[in-house]
Amino acid sequence: MFGEQFEAAVKKREKEFATYDEVKVFFTTWNVGGFEPSKEYDLSGLFNNFEGKGTPEVVVFAIQELVTKNATNLITSTTNEAAVQKWADIILANLKKHDNYLFVRERTLIGITLFLFVKNSIRERVQKIGADLIKTGVGGNFGNKGSVVIKFCIDDSSFALINGHLEAGASSNSTRLMNLIDIHERAFQEEGVGKIRVSKCVI
């Protein structure tokens, strides 16, 4: 009873200690199938809804099969850094046709990549940026399955973004659910090679 009364009292006086600001987030997922674009590749078709509605403060690209898998990179979980950088440059160049965006962070597990961009106008408000990767293939040792995660805060609001590649097929529902639980429990929980943390948005 007291808890409910306290909550109601706090809610009533909320405007005295809390302010709110709307932040638009654009999130797209794309399986590029190992496609290698030119530096001038046009992505304008993806941003048609930017016109007339105001550009979003945050833009997230979740790409699958940025590079095609082979036996070597499945075992070693190697990343084609040149391909990742090329896609980051292409996306940013296209975004800058609409507003002054900045590239903030990416995280890659073989061909699964997550890119985070924000408008320059909110860069000082973006804090506590972290990135992680979680392997779920073959007992958590191989990167053929798994996810990449980026977390950050805008003011006092927390965001967590996940791009994953899990078991395929209707018969694997239980496996996928277990993988999601595993990803949730392991992300950012241990220090290691997969973890990247910075205190603020450094461009």
What is the predicted function of each stretch?
Residues E57-V60, A160, C201-I203:
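Hydrophobic beta-strand segments of well-ordered beta-sheets in folded domains
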Residues M1-T108, I112-F115, S172-T175, N179-H184, ...:
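N-terminal, active-site-proximal structural segment of metallo-dependent hydrolase catalytic domains
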Residues R125, D132, G140-N144, C153-D155, ...:
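Eukaryote-biased recognition of electropositive, low-complexity segments
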